[in-house]
């Protein structure tokens, strides 16, 4: 496996059999202080390289376009995993083996949710607005409703994000 220099793996999720997860870190040489679309274009090669390092087929990567809302969608396609952009979506969930989920975050939090019993997982983009709207609760409710998950079985991991004392927040 290539270098994991720009990848963070979380021990609580790494302990779960069959779950591949990662938080791709910012590359210090890529300038992202610009418009969103330009920044995403600049990051594209870096992200593809990191996905390949993890053995993730980007043709099987579902993503949302992060609108700071509370919509969570199931990404369980018929006929196999697909590369899909889910518009107006901040959360994704699946039970499909080989279906990868991705969200982009800058200062917002990425919340990983995994159910080792039902072998379901979700990934949400949760900034201030999404947190106030209850996006993580929405994802858990969807997992309970669609996959029969018991909230007591869930492992939840919050990725690095802005927070006190480094930033003043009013939640």
Model-identified regions with their sequence ranges:
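Active-site microenvironment for binding and transforming phosphate-containing groups
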Residues: 1-171
């Amino acid at each position: 496996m290539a270098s994991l220099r720009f990848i963070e793996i979380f021990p609580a999720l790494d302990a779960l059999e069959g779950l591949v997860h990662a938080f791709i870190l910012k590359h210090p040489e890529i300038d992202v202080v610009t418009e969103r679309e330009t920044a995403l274009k600049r990051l594209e090669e870096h992200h593809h390289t990191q996905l390949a390092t993890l053995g993730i087929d980007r043709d099987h990567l579902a993503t949302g376009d992060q609108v700071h809302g509370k919509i969570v969608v199931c990404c369980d396609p018929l006929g196999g995993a697909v590369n899909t952009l889910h518009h107006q979506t901040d959360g994704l969930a699946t039970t499909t083996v080989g279906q990868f989920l991705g969200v982009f975050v800058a200062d917002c939090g990425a919340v990983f949710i995994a159910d080792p019993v039902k072998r379901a997982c979700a990934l949400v983009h949760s900034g201030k607005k999404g947190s106030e709207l209850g996006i993580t609760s929405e994802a858990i409710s969807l997992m309970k409703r669609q996959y029969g998950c018991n909230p007591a079985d869930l492992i939840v991991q919050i990725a690095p994000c802005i927070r006190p004392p480094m930033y003043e927040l009013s939640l």
